[in-house]
């Protein structure tokens, strides 16, 4: 994995938070836990997270609404919705508001780990693509400036 991935677990159920933390930390991830959307927003202002596991039902805000708030402030963070109340409507809303994956409770931890791994690979691929585009732009711009410089010195 190289650098340790950071995961933010946002769930109001303490048992779920503890189970996820134990398993994810055993897999080598750095994990932070919060029980409200407000605390999640505060954490993401101070720290970078590769992934957020977001419960649909939180005491202060719906997880879907939290997705919308996080979409602009944490665009590189992968967002995975976890819910014990799966409906087609909330699945569609989740995807439309920026969820990268959707997991139904009670969840199979193997599926959760596989989803996290897939999301991290996608995040890494997007980052590499972005870096390549920047390098391409810089290379093109340097060539253009060199041509302009030569033209002005003639």
Give the role of each language-model region.
Residues 5, 36, 62-65:
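Acidic catalytic/metal-coordinating carboxylates
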Residues 17, 59, 83:
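The feature encodes the CheY-like receiver
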Residues 42, 64-76:
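Short amphipathic alpha-helix used as the core "switch/output" element in two-component signaling
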Residues 107-117:
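C-terminal output helix
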Residues 123-154:
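CheY-like receiver
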